[in-house]
């Protein structure tokens, strides 16, 4: 199996968690509830991608 099994998902997950966190913090600082919700959703998406990457890696072992 490919060495990068799950690594792409983990990388996308990390990016989404970081960007989502930034959007959430920006939304809090500017009192923009929409941006906060968008950031929280993107962080959650990142968590799912990270877990998916872990599962793919585990299955490829």
UniProtKB/Swiss-Prot annotation:
Record Gene3D superfamilies: YjbJ
SUPFAM superfamilies for this protein: Hypothetical protein YjbJ
InterPro entries noted in UniProt: CsbD, YjbJ_sf
Region annotation Disordered: where it falls in the sequence: 1-61
Top-level lineage group: Bacteria
Family to which this protein belongs: Belongs to the UPF0337 (CsbD) family.
Designated name of the protein: UPF0337 protein lmo2158
Organism: Listeria monocytogenes serovar 1/2a (strain ATCC BAA-679 / EGD-e)
Lineage: Bacteria, Bacillati, Bacillota, Bacilli, Bacillales
